[in-house]
Structure formats: structure tokens, C-alpha cells
Amino acid sequence: MPLSTKDSLLVTQFRAITGTSSAEAAKYIKRYKHIEAAVDAFYNNEPAPRADPAQERKLGEIWEKFKDPSDPKLIKIDGTMELCEELDIDPGTDAVLFCLAADLGSKATGEWEKAPFVAGIASYPGNIDSLPKLKAYLPTLRKKLVSDPEYFKKVYNHAFQLARGGPQSLTRSLPLDTAIDLWTLFFPPAFNHSPSALSHLPDNSPPQFTQPEFDLWIEFMQQKNKAVSKDTWALLVDFARGIDKDFKEYDEDGAWPSMIDDFVEYVREQKRGQ
């Protein structure tokens, strides 16, 4: 059941105080009803209420449907493709799969353990306990990804971990082609959305780093032709949200990766030549 207007306001207050996710905040508000009691429970380390047992059972059955026959502790690539087909997700063009990966605790591309899979779906509002209900919730995740800066960064950074091979991988960077594919998946949809996950700081005004600047970034990276480090990947979002249209407000003494320093100089040279 959707939250009432009053409860939605309480969730916003709870998140502002505790820094938790919307789903986690909603669980505390639904259980404790009042902001003071919910915050006290959070800081006293009382767990958020678990999903309804019937919901957990049904979600477990969904996971079982897609688990790998040769490795019954995981859903793997084949099962993920079947899941995507049932949810009408094109994994090559729809970033919502990365939303699910981040929310459902996927540690490697196309792999899902049962417990975080069940807990992740149960954390969504609306008592989702079937594939049709999960499919109906995907537009909400797509909208959240392009409009919520906190959520965008969470999903975007999780995508880096998946693409480099998961937390156990010794690979510390992404091949450039992979990074470009992912940047193209994440950034352009957020540019024209209002509110935007890439809104300009500090006033959350419309983005000033938009498609033309993004195209220059891709052009620059293709000329450099180097793998993309974790720092460059993560800080590109902060850079995009802070830079002005004319690239005049860049803090050259800030702790930016050298790749971003070089990009700023590249753009300034382009602008001087116009």
C-alpha cells in the first residue's frame, strides 16, 4: 500500500536525520508511526521490521525459479536473462537492471544470492510478492535513477564494481569501451529530467554539464585511450554536478583525478579556439 502524504513527509524527515534509504525509512515509519519513536529505534539499533513471512516465501519461490541448476546457491547469467525477459528488461539498454543489482545485492554481473534478492525486493514499498508486481514497480526505479542524486550515485558506483568483476576482482579499472557504454547508459537520461540526478550544485538547478559537455568527455577519453580508474569513475559525477557551463569555476587545487584536470584544460582549449 502506498504511503499516505503524512507518512511520506515523515519518511523525508527520517531520511534527513538518519541518512537511510527511502525503503528503510518507510519501514521504520510504518512500524513506529511517529518520527521521534522511529529515530530512537534507529539509533538504538533496533532492526527494521522484516518482510511478511508470506511475502518472503513467495519471493523465495521466484528466486528458486531462476536459480542455476549447476550452482543452486545462485541465479547466474542464464537465469538473469530469463528474469529480464519476464520483466521486459533489455539488459543492454535499460539501466533499471543496475538498479535491481544495487538494491538486491548482486555481487557479480548476472549473479544473485537468495537472501539479498528476497530482502531487496521486500524492501520496496507495495508488498511486492510476484513478478507482475515487480515489473509494475520498475518505472518507479527508472524515474528514481534519473531524478535522485543519492540513488544515482549508489547505482552508478555499484555498476563499476560489477563491471570490473565484483569485490573479489583484482582488476582496479574498467576498459574504456566498457566505461563509455555505461556512461552512455547512465548520464544522458538524467540530463533532461526535472528534477535531475545531475542537478547543478549548490542550488540543485538544472544541470550545466549536459549532452555537449558529455560528448566532449567521451571524445577526450577516446583520444586518451586509457582504462578508467575508480576515482575517475566516481568523481565524474561530482565534477558534472559542480562544473559551470563555461568551465570557469573549476577548483584546480581540489583533489580531482588528473584525468579530470586534463579534461578541463582540453575543454578550455576548445572554447578558446571557438
From Swiss-Prot:
Specify the protein name: Defective in cullin neddylation protein 1
Q: Which species is the source of this protein? A: Cryptococcus neoformans var. neoformans serotype D (strain JEC21 / ATCC MYA-565)
Function statement = May contribute to neddylation of cullin components of SCF-type E3 ubiquitin ligase complexes. Neddylation of cullins play an essential role in the regulation of SCF-type complexes activity.
Q: Where is the DCUN1 domain positioned along the sequence?
A: 54-268
One of the Pfam families matching this protein, by short name: UBA_4
Determine if Ubl conjugation is one of this entry's keywords.
Answer: no
Source organism lineage? Eukaryota, Fungi, Dikarya, Basidiomycota, Agaricomycotina
- Underlying gene: DCN1
Matching InterPro entries:
DCN-prot, DCN1-like_PONY, PONY_dom
Q: Thylakoid: is it a keyword of this entry?
A: no
Q: Which UniProt keywords apply?
A: Ubl conjugation pathway
Q: Name one GO cellular component term.
A: ubiquitin ligase complex
Q: Which GO terms describe its molecular function?
A: cullin family protein binding; ubiquitin conjugating enzyme binding; ubiquitin-like protein binding
User: Where is each UBA-like domain found?
Assistant: 7-43
- Look up the record and give one Gene Ontology term from the biological process aspect: protein neddylation
